[in-house]
């Protein structure tokens, strides 16, 4: 009888823990959703647009940072609308040097007034992300998979902001995003789309 009671307690605790984990990523106060849209394959990887949406109802982000761990030995060849904070060791490359060879890169937004040829839509706001707004950047990833079967989602994703701590769930492969051209006469779709959901944890 005592053994049965102990088993029931353990099951209740596990269920409660799962409930907390589920609720944490479906907060009534909204969340930060980060979407990776893979747009083109390259000889050694892909080009993607990464967009962060602030679905929080009342919390503004004063300056975001994103980081993740590559599941292969990926490098970031170049970026538009954002930059990595460190290049890392790229000594194995000759001639064309990647922007970052760091296994877990950290990315920050560019400043307003960035030259137009370094921008994309919804970038360059110093990382400020107001409720209901979005921020985006483009990156070219190399030494990565270049097909639906071989491209790998980022792991250990982190979204940070000054005096704000967030908890991010795992990357998920979702239905590819559809895009409408400016003249509204053509619809295209991403090759693949990955989603990461992050929720506010506490002020720091």
Swiss-Prot record:
Expressed in roots, stems, leaves, flowers and siliques. The keyword Transmembrane helix does not apply. GO terms for biological process: cellulose microfibril organization; response to oomycetes. Keywords: Glycoprotein, Signal. It comes from the Eukaryota. Residues 1-24 form the signal peptide. Glycans are attached at residues 31, 195. GO terms for cellular component: membrane. COBL5 appears to be a truncated member of the COBRA family due to an in-frame mutation that introduces a stop codon. This truncated gene is actively transcribed. Belongs to the COBRA family. This is COBRA-like protein 5. The gene is COBL5.
């Amino acid at each position: 009888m005592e053994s049965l009671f102990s088993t029931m307690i353990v099951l209740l605790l596990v269920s409660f823990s799962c409930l907390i984990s589920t609720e944490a990523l479906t907060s009534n106060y909204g969340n930060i959703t980060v979407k990776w849209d893979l747009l083109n394959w390259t000889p050694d990887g892909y080009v993607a647009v990464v967009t962060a949406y602030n679905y929080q109802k009342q919390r503004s982000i004063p300056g975001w940072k994103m980081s993740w761990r590559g599941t292969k030995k990926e490098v970031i060849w170049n970026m538009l609308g954002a930059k990595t904070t460190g290049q890392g060791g790229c000594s194995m490359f000759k001639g064309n040097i990647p922007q970052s060879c760091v296994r877990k890169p950290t990315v920050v937004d560019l400043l307003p007034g960035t030259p137009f040829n370094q921008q994309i839509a919804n970038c360059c706001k110093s990382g400020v992300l107001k409720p209901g707004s979005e921020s985006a950047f483009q990156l070219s990833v190399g030494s990565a998979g270049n097909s639906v079967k071989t491209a790998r989602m980022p792991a250990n994703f982190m979204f940070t902001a000054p005096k704000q701590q967030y908890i991010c769930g795992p990357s998920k492969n979702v239905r590819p995003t559809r895009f409408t051209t400016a003249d509204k006469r053509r619809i295209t779709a991403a090759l693949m789309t990955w989603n990461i959901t992050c929720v506010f944890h506490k002020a720091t």
